[in-house]
């Protein structure tokens, strides 16, 4: 139930982030949110903190994702097939997904995501040297690194040791985001604060316990139902005020665009008797 509630919140937050439009005067559109706890890491392999999951979800993508009804939908994988015996899952990847620009890539331009990237990313979750908190995703389900196979650049396969009907749903977890091997290996443990993914926003700045800034990924691959490029926002700015009253005052002053976990005692400060925002 806790996971379902978290997924629902993430979907609501994503909807808000993607649906905000630019002002008529073409000002930069920044989404301001407060997180009541600091992040533990921006590395998907350690996405165990609720707030980290929300922010990592802006920077990274996986094979699949959930829609507003919590149905598993395509993301970087455009289609997939499950073997009749339930022991292998084969994913066909999009060919228009690129990692965000980084100096470690040729000419500083993000390269195309391949099946090899997923094989590397998923093995990280079970690699004892990494000690990922997401190892449970594949625990007792895969054998070792040989379970993650890049059949070619655009076809990725996972081999299970036994059938697990809900397996595809597990892959929507933020732990299962794709990361670039060369960047992770270059930064090592510092990848936690130098993340490079494929998501709608790219990392800009993080001062722990104070502020996190993400900028629009101009090369993001997803579009809305009308074919318009997402995201519509130019940036996301997260502050880390752990005192709820102080954070709520910032919301009332319109310094924040989104506020969650509203205490019932604040209801009259933000809602009229008819239920409208004051």
Describe the function of each predicted region:
Residues 34-84, 123, 130, 196:
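N-terminal lobe/hinge region of extracytoplasmic solute-binding protein
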Residues 118, 154-156, 247, 252-261:
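Alpha-to-beta junction loops
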Residues 21-23:
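Bacterial signal peptide processing site
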Residues 78-130, 247-250:
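Aromatic- and charge-enriched surface segment that lines or borders ligand/interaction sites
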Residues 16-19:
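C-terminal motif of bacterial Sec signal peptides marking the signal peptidase cleavage site
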Residues 100, 159-177, 192-246, 267-278:
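Aromatic-rich, solvent-exposed beta-strand/loop patch
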Residues 81, 117, 130-181, 207:
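Surface-exposed binding/hinge segments that line
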Residues 29-40, 78, 88-92, 118-121, ...:
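Short, well-ordered beta-strand elements
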